[in-house]
Amino acid sequence: MKMSIFQLLMAAALGTGIVPTVTLAASPGDAADVQPRVDAARATAGAFLQQLGSTMKREMQAGGPAAAMKVCREVAPRAANDISLEKGWKVTRVGTRVRNPMLGTPDAWEQRVLLEFEQRAAQGEKFAEMTRVEVVEEPSGKSLRFMKAIGLAPQCVVCHGSPDQIPDSVRAELDAMYPHDRAVNYRPGDLRGAVSIKQPLDD
């Protein structure tokens, strides 16, 4: 069976222990066309995370963990949806362990990239600049896929840490809102998830 360029690169990477970040184009001439889309995705993901971080900090200072949970539960999905509608993309956050299966569950491609992010982090790469870009073919058409890693900040352990780090009041609210919650037992600096952007290319 003939291997794709990506499969060949991944096979070589596994042999060396280094997993590369690559941008794949359907043909050599596509690279120049794709790069502006990559730049736009990178800028959008960065602005999205900056907005959420600022809002989270403000709400945490004003109302504590309960107010911060509202940012993750309401503000982040609404902001992602607004960007998706504005740009005609699919913008979302996915997690290594999900709190809300309806919103944060990664698809097969996202699962693979999250695993790659963890491997790259184990080799010393920082989450702040960790991204993956790939042009993929799916039954629905060709799309540019972009992911930017999200590391767990120290202040996030009050909602995502070990049982002794999550206050009883927060745990009770999490249990009520997220009966299938698995997004706990993280430590600061762990990979929490990623911003995932999917841009259709067949338009």
Description of each model-found segment:
Residues 1-5:
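Positively charged n-region of N-terminal signal peptides that target proteins for export
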Residues 9-20:
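Bacterial N-terminal signal peptides
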Residues 20-28:
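Signal peptide processing junction and immediate N-terminal pro/mature segment
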Residues 27-153, 165-203:
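Extracytoplasmic c-type cytochrome modules immediately beyond a signal peptide or single-pass transmembrane anchor
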Residues 157-164:
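Detector for the c-type heme attachment site
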